Amino acid sequence: MIRFSFWNSIAGYFQSIAKKLSRRAEHSLTEKTDQDFVFEVIGEKRFPNATQLKYLTKFYSPTELLISKIALFLALASSLALGILLYQNNLVRKPAEGGEYAEAVIGAPTYINPLFAQTNDVDQDIARLVFGSLMKLDENGNLVADLAERYDIDPLATTYTFTLHPGARWHDGEPLSAQDVLFTVQSIQDQSFKSPLYVTFRNVRVQAPDERTVSFTLAEPFAPFLSVMTFGILPEHLWQDVDPAHAILAELNLKPVGSGPYRFGQFVKDKNGNIKEYRLERFDEYYGPGPFIKDLTLKFFGSFEEAYAAFESGNVDGIGFLPQHQTPANTDQAAVHKFSLPQYTALFFNQAANPALKEKEVRLALSLATDKRGIIDSAFGGDALPVAGPILPGMLGYAQTKSATLFDPAQAEKLLDDAGWKRERPESEDAEAAGAAIVTRGSTTLGTQGEEQLPYTRTKNNAELALTLTAIQRDDSIIVAETLRDLWQGIGVKVNLNIVEIASIQKDIIKPRAYEVLLFGQIIGKDPDPYPFWHSSQANDPGLNLALYQNKAVDALLEDARKTSDAATREQKYAAFQTQLSQDVPAIFLYSLQYAYLTPENLKGIATERINHPSDRFANIASWYIKTKKRLQF
């Protein structure tokens, strides 16, 4: 009975399968007919339109309809979440046009003209913003094309050909052409202009074969030639009628028309006629990218203390230079940028102004009595590099001819003794007077007591061994000067200090070479070419040979080094130059500093790492921004 029931069940199972297959076949025929009907209705698109979709509810069961609604909701929610996620992950802040920036600068403008600006840092600052140049520095201190779209150098390295950017225009709307470059160089070569660039271009032949091409032909190779192509170009159509002999008096020197990222807006004078503010506006037709910041204002101050007070009061947003010892009080609102700068500070001897300085033994004794590490610790908290010569470590041709920190006051005293400078002990009643150090600011004597009384003075042929040390009125510079005074008076040299305002140092002191010993910094640029600073032809203004150094052998070395692009040959010439300079002691090389720049925290885009001159802090000014806007970026 059981066996029968089992087989009966199996038979029933297969019968049910057969019935299902039969029904499926019938349904298949019906379904095919339905599909054909639907496709015929909806056409080739094979997707129902909105009118047809509303009938879906008539074919769905309640359960199927619920499932469809849930699926549709999940699909919409997922799409929305994915969209929000993509938006958040790809939404970035981009620089936007707008904003204003005001910067405090020490000094005042005089000639905002590329032909004259080399002797005034303020002029160079503004010229960098207003004028375009064939070459410029990028944020890493490398030379890149600016007004030049490209350039070529012939195999002999004597012909440089530049092709100008086709979109370059002057701020007055006129197109910039090769004729403007030709006119600018010919003006430099005209001695009536008295441009400091004359020496560099006096033997250069310049041609403009067409509107966009200009070529320079040198009499012989000049290795640093590309680096001098950073001078600004003047508009011929505005300067061609200006008498070269009176060019320095032209109104265009204070209301310049250039081709750079910013154009002249206006300047503000005080009641005495001194320019206190200089306002620049974004040039919308600038050939390069940017700029973003709408308005720039430079405000001028006589000292860093005044500039810093203006920063703390909110009168300015930044300061063009921040001394090493200074730190902003509110670091949340300020950013300090430190740039590598090829610069050294030295003591330059003007032997013509003080007979005692003509003696090499005196100059060498002063050098041996100079404690560079002590000076760096006192003035900069140790944050400076002691140097021994005019070519800095890491630069082409650097050669350490002697220790950068040699300090031997005992040997210094012996040198002076052997040179006939006799020690004179001051009388007791005159001791106080002998120990007083004289400090002058400008032409005003302030007479202050020295930190230490002179242990003795020195005389030779009834002449006292005394000198005047001139320094700029800035805290760190004054500390250095006072430290030097104490060190030198320790070996019997009487020292008077002359502290001069930064704004007048060029005009009143450097230009007429009105100093005996000058504490001053020199910026040597990317190429270490010492010619502008140590060749005898540069001893007088507008040259930069502040020691008035003259040595025919050195002149020949510097001239030969300029004529070759071979690095090994240049290094050999520079090594011989440094050896001779070390033997002659025309100056005492002290230290090299980084360049610190103070800006507001909301000023972005400053990517500069290396500069060759303080004005190069504006090298990527077109990338700076204050305002931002949100954009999607995939």
PLM regions: where:
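Detector for C-terminal structural segments
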Residues: 2-38, 369-403, 475-485, 506-634
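Aromatic- and charge-enriched surface segment that lines or borders ligand/interaction sites
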Residues: 6-7, 11-45, 149-194, 215, ...
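N-terminal lobe/hinge region of extracytoplasmic solute-binding protein
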Residues: 105-155, 186, 257
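A structural "hinge/loop" feature
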Residues: 107-124, 147-148, 174, 196, ...
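Gly/Pro-rich hinge or "lid" segments in bacterial periplasmic/extracellular proteins
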Residues: 128, 231-295, 305, 313, ...
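Surface-exposed binding/hinge segments that line
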Residues: 197-244, 263
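Append "and occasionally in soluble cytosolic enzymes with long acidic Gly/Pro-rich linkers
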Residues: 277-282, 358-486, 576, 630-631
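Ligand-site clamp/hinge motif
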Residues: 283-329, 485, 494-496
